[in-house]
Amino acid sequence: MTLSLEQLSARMRQGEDIPLSDTARIALALSIPSILEQLVVTAMEYIDAAMVGHIGAEATAAIGIVSSSTWLLHGILVGLYTAFSIQIAQYLGADRRQDARGVLRQSMLFNLILGLGAAAFGVGISRFLPGWLGADISLQADASAYFAIWSAALPFTMAMGMYTAMLRATGDALTPSLISVLVCALDVVFNFFLINPTRQIQLFGQSVTVWGAGLEVPGAALGTALSTTIGGLLALGVLLLRDGPLCIRKPGSWRITSACLRNLWRVGTPLAAERAALSSAQVLLVRIVSGLGTVAIAANSLGVSAEGLCYMAGYGIQDASIALIGQAVGAHRRDMAKRFAWLCTMMGIGIMALSGMGLWLFAPALMGIFTADAAVIALGAQVLRIEAFAEPMFGASIVASGAMQGAGDSTGCFVLNLFSMWGVRLTLAFLLAPRLGLVGVWAAMCIELCIRGALFLIRLARGKWLDKGALQ
C-alpha cells in the first residue's frame, strides 16, 4: 500500500527510516498524474497549434512572434507564486498547518494585486510589442491582438497555476491534473468555434452547418483565455470548499506577515529573476529567428510546441520533486531530501531519454500535425532531430532544479540557468544563425541544454543546495 504524503511526513518527523521501496512508490504516485497531465496538456496544445497552423504560416508566425513575451511575463509570475507553494510544502512537512493556511490566504491577496497589475501591463504594451520584436508589418495586428487577449486573462491563469501547485504541495496530484485536462479540452472546443468561420462539416454521412466566429488568431487567444479563466475559478473553488491541512474555512488571519514576505523574497525573487532571465533570452532568440524569414519563424514556433511532448514529462516529475523535497526539508530530514532528489532526477532522465528517441523517429510526423506547409515541416523536423539528443540532460536540469527549489535553493538555480542560457545558448545562436540559419539556433540550444544538465547534476552531487535549510 502506497503511503500518502501526509503519512510520509509524519514518519519523517518521527525520525523513522523509510524503506526505498516506499519512497519510490510515493514518488511515482505523485509523478504519474502530473506526467499524464502534462502529456494531455501537450496533446491539446498540439491540437491548438494545428488549428492555427492550418490557417496558414503567417498565423503561426504571428503567435510565434509574441510567444516568448508570454513566456517572459507568465514566467515571472510563476517564479513568484512558486515560492508560496514551496512555503506550504515545508510548513506541512514541519506540521505547521496554521502557518501553511496563513500563506494560502496571503497568496490569494498576492494573486489579486499582481495578477491585475500584470494584466494591465500586458494589455498596455500589446499594441507596440510586435514592432519592438521586429515582426513584419503583415503579422503585427494579429500578434498584438493575441497578446492583449492573453494578457487580460492573467489573473485567472495565475490563479490556476498557483492553487494547483498548492494542492500538489499537500500530496494531491490528481485534482490539479483533472483541472488541467479539463482546461485543455475546453480550449480545443472554444478554438473550434472561435477560430473557424461558420461552415459545413460531414457528420455520420450528413452535411451539418456548424457556427463559427471566424476570428482566426484572436479566436485562439480568446479560447485560451476563457478556458484558463474556468480553470482558475475551479482551482480556487477546490481550495475554498475542501477540508484538510489547507482548509481555509478554519479561523485565521488574512494579515500579510513579515515571515511570508521574507520567504517570498528569499525564494521567490531568485525564481522570478531566473524566469525573467530565461524568458528574456527567449525573446532575444525570437528576435534572431525573426530575421530568418516566415518559414523559419513558423518552424521554430511549431518545433517548440512539438518538443513539448518530450520535456513536459520532466516538468510533471519536477512538480512531484518540489512537494516531496519541500516536505522532507520541513521535517528536517536531509537524508530523505537527497534520496528524493536523486530518485526523481533519475526518473526524469530516463523518461526524457525515451521521449527523445521518439522525437527523433517521428519528427516529420509531429510537424505534419501542425501544418501542411512542406517547407515548414522539413525545417521543423530537421531542428527537432538535433534537439532530441539533448533531452536526457534537459530532463536532469528540469528535475534537479525542482529538487533545489523545494529545498529553498532558488538562488543556485538562477545562477546556473543564467550562465547556461546567456553565456552559452545566446552566444552560440548569435554566432551560428547567420551561417546555419534556424539549424544553427537549435544546435546552440542542444549544446546549451547538455551543459546545463551537467551543471545541475554536479551541484546536486555536491549537496550544497541543502545548506539553505528550512524556511522561516
Regions found by a protein language model. Give the residues of each.
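Short alpha-helical transmembrane segments in multi-pass integral membrane proteins
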Residues: 1-34, 88-155, 186, 202-269, ...
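N-terminal transmembrane alpha-helices
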Residues: 18-50, 54-55, 68-87, 112-119, ...
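Transmembrane helical elements of multi-pass membrane transporters/channels
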Residues: 29-48, 149, 160, 227-231, ...
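Helix-terminus/linker motif at the lipid-water interface of multi-pass membrane proteins
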Residues: 39-61, 130-137, 193-198, 207-215, ...
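Alpha-helical transmembrane segments of multipass membrane proteins
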Residues: 46-50, 128, 162-166, 188-193, ...
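Small-residue-rich hydrophobic transmembrane alpha-helices
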Residues: 60-120, 157-176, 286, 299-357, ...
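Small-residue-enriched core segments of transmembrane alpha-helices in multipass membrane transport
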Residues: 180-187, 305-308, 418-427
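C-terminal structured "cap/appendage" subdomains that terminate the fold
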Residues: 400-437, 443
